[in-house]
């Protein structure tokens, strides 16, 4: 009997652990009152930390999908962006296709067949078990551009998707898919409104072409809840012959500027970089002999964007986003690209994004603003410092270990406690207590390579961090959020 009681207790604990602490336990996702962030219905903040798993539905089997999603959760990701279909029809690893009767889904569920959409259901449900939202890019933009989806078919497809997934707790809808919004806009409008007419539970956005923000075309659209931009994969000066260039020359890596350009459109909505440069992908994408983006590059993109005001960030990896494995060709590289998606999970950038999420959730969330007035004598490009702050804390990201001349009077308190956080490890080092005035700080790196990080200054009357604290808590700031008007 005693053994039975112990076994039953363990079973209850296992079930409870599996069922507890899911993000949607806080309610549905919504836009914050100040229109700049995402939150849950109960008022808790949602910091978007996305992973790019474009070909997950097509290339991974059930066991692989589970391992991948488990790895994402362990690394702190709470969103995985996928291409729901990348062909008309699309085929998955089991040889099943997405469209067995065109855009008529009446007989899509075939008895005794583990179909394409059954596998998609499995992925959505497995993600839910790990507390992850699936960012469903409904159809890739190139297919719409090629005329594979008409306005009427978009209504059918949107109705099918909405009815199938409206009651799943972990769906975020994406229109677009690497495409400008003025290409077949009537199709995107039809697809989006068809879904929104049925599904009242989930938020929606649009994934644009590189170097664009969705606000350029959809700022007034009734269906879009928040914006995304794609800062893209080019280095400074890598224009690559484009005639119509939507950004100033030599600003390709300045993804922080897209936050400002998005907020020039009204009404203001939350925004994030849904596709920055991917770790280990050739700069500019198409030349396998080019240099590749490293972990410190993807960290820079993440901190620059978020400190500029983004409501989160999406990371990507060349091998993972393609789900590369033996038997599949690479789209961005050459025959010498032998790194698999599961090897990519071990790369440093994939595992370092979680420290940004921990940092942003360690302080009162909704009062945070971008504030470059904190910084004096700032530089450009890689030497540019970027600052964000609340009422009683400020954060300054430093990519190049430059001197930081900072105005500590921008936040409350006669004295400020100051820490340095190493972006690659999340390690904290207490630097001391300082008077509230303009002070020049310099963090001395321990190595010759890039050792980027964040200077953290907090009103000494506040206890968001402890002086002897060496890592940030994954639980974040748990106190009730302050009234924005106080």
Predicted regions and their residues:
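Hydrophobic h-region of N-terminal signal peptides that target proteins for export
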Residues: 10-18
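Sec-dependent N-terminal signal peptides
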Residues: 6-9, 300
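Catalytic-core region of carbohydrate-active enzymes that cleave or remodel glycosidic bonds
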Residues: 221-325
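Aromatic- and carboxylate-lined catalytic core of secreted/periplasmic carbohydrate-active enzymes
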Residues: 44, 267-271, 278-281, 294-432, ...
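Positively charged n-region of N-terminal signal peptides that target proteins for export
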Residues: 1-4
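Active-site mouth of glycoside hydrolases
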Residues: 22-238, 246-249, 253-254
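Short strand-edge motifs at loop-to-beta-strand transitions and within beta-strands
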Residues: 439-441
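Short beta-strand segments
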Residues: 174-176, 205-208, 228, 272-275, ...
């Amino acid at each position: 009997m005693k053994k039975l009681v112990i076994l039953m207790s363990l079973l209850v604990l296992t079930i409870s652990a599996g069922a507890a602490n899911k993000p949607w336990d806080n309610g549905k996702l919504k836009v914050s009152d100040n229109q700049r962030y995402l939150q849950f219905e109960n008022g808790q903040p949602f910091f978007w930390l996305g992973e790019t798993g474009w070909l997950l539905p097509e290339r991974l089997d059930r066991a692989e999908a589970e391992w991948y999603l488990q790895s994402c959760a362990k690394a702190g990701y709470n969103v995985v962006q996928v291409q729901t279909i990348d062909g008309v029809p699309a085929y998955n690893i089991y040889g099943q296709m997405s469209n067995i009767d065109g855009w008529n889904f009446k007989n899509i569920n075939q008895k005794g067949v583990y179909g394409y959409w059954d596998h998609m259901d499995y992925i959505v449900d497995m993600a839910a078990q790990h507390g992850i939202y699936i960012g469903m890019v409904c159809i890739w933009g190139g297919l719409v551009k090629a005329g594979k989806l008409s306005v009427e078919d978009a209504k059918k497809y949107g109705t099918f998707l909405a009815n199938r997934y409206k009651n799943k707790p972990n769906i975020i809808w994406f229109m677009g898919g690497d495409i400008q919004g003025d290409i077949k806009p009537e199709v995107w409008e039809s697809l989006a409104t068809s879904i929104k007419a049925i599904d009242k539970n989930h938020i929606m956005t649009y994934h644009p072409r590189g170097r664009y923000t969705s606000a350029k075309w959809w700022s007034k659209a009734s269906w879009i809840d928040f914006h995304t931009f794609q800062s893209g994969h080019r280095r400074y000066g890598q224009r690559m012959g484009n005639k119509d260039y939507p950004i100033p020359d030599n600003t390709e890596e300045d993804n922080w500027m897209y936050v400002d350009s998005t907020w020039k459109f009204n009404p203001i909505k939350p925004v994030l970089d849904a596709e920055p440069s991917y770790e280990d992908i050739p700069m500019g994408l198409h030349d396998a002999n080019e240099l590749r983006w490293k972990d410190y590059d993807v960290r820079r993109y993440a901190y620059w964007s978020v400190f500029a005001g983004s409501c989160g960030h999406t990371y990507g990896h060349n091998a993972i986003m393609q789900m590369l494995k033996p038997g599949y060709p690479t789209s961005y590289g050459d025959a010498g690209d032998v790194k698999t998606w599961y090897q990519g999970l071990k790369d440093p950038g994939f595992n370092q994004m979680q420290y940004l999420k921990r940092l942003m959730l360690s302080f009162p969330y909704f009062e945070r603003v971008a504030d470059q007035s904190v910084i004096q004598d700032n530089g450009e490009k890689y030497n540019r410092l970027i600052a964000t702050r609340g009422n009683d804390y400020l954060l300054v990201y430093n990519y190049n270990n430059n001197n930081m001349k900072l105005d500590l009077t921008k936040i409350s308190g006669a004295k400020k406690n100051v820490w340095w956080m190493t972006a690659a490890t999340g390690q904290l080092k207490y630097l001391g207590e300082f008077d509230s005035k303009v002070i020049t700080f310099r963090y001395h790196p321990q190595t010759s390579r890039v050792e980027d990080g964040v200077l953290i200054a907090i009103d000494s009357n506040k206890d968001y961090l402890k002086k002897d604290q060496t890592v940030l808590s994954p639980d974040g700031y748990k106190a009730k959020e302050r009234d924005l008007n106080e």
